[in-house]
């Protein structure tokens, strides 16, 4: 008689959704987090001062530059970067704990952070790049935010640099219609979750049948 399949034992994964500013990444990731209890947002460590309403361990882990540098030197950060004079990074411990418990972690990083995560956690990172339908459409979205022309020009230049790395991601989603883009990202996440290599229970289950992977 066939042994029943266990319902637990899957290793978690790291989901990176990268995109140029204005492509809709925040809208997509907010929707995923709201509907999926198995997906949690990675909490970064930063050297910037807390803003009003921000809580330690909820929005960020706030550290001095000296503390941050020590964490990086000791290998406690999966990835890190310096942005506008402040340091940001991903603490290793909480992510590894989540993965071992079968939870999936969503990261708000750029293409450089994606590569650092892949190096630190080979086999655990799924990368999706979100594109706008066109650069003209992206410019229109940025204009709709009410940004000043010089800010829009800066963001468009940064977008071109970011888009140049789209080929380094295994998945790409074009955000023409937001609900469809959300559904595509959801489908990719589901497929990644069901990969054979993530099913920690499988070897034991097959062993009970006298089989092996």
UniProtKB/Swiss-Prot annotation:
Q: Where in the cell is it found?
A: Cytoplasm
Q: Does the keyword Heme apply?
A: no
Q: Which UniProt keywords apply?
A: ATP-binding, Cytoplasm, Kinase, Nucleotide-binding, Transferase
Check the UniProt entry and state the signal peptide residues, or none. none
Top EC class, one word: transferase
Q: Does the keyword Nucleotide-binding apply?
A: yes
Main localization is cytoplasm
Family, similarity comment = Belongs to the guanylate kinase family.
Query: What is the annotated role of this protein in its UniProt record?
Result: Essential for recycling GMP and indirectly, cGMP.
The name on file for this protein is Guanylate kinase
This protein's gene is called: gmk
């Amino acid at each position: 008689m066939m042994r029943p399949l266990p319902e637990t034992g899957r290793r978690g994964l790291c989901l990176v959704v990268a995109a140029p500013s204005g492509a809709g990444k925040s809208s997509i990731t907010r929707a995923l987090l709201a509907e999926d209890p198995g997906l949690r947002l990675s909490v970064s460590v930063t050297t910037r001062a807390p803003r009003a309403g921000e809580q330690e361990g909820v929005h960020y882990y706030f550290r001095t530059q000296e503390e941050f540098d020590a964490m990086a030197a000791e290998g406690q950060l999966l990835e890190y970067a310096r942005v506008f004079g402040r340091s940001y990074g991903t603490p290793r411990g909480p992510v590894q704990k989540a993965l071992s418990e079968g939870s999936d972690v969503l990261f708000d990083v750029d293409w450089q952070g994606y590569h650092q995560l892949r190096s630190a956690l080979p086999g655990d990172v799924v990368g999706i790049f979100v594109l706008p339908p066109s650069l003209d459409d992206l410019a229109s979205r940025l204009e709709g935010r009410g940004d000043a022309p010089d800010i829009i020009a800066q963001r468009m230049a940064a977008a071109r640099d970011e888009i140049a790395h789209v080929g380094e991601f295994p998945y790409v989603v074009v955000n023409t219609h937001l609900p469809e883009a959300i559904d595509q990202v959801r489908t990719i996440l589901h497929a990644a979750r069901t990969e054979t290599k993530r099913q920690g229970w499988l070897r034991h289950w097959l062993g009970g049948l006298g089989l092996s992977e």
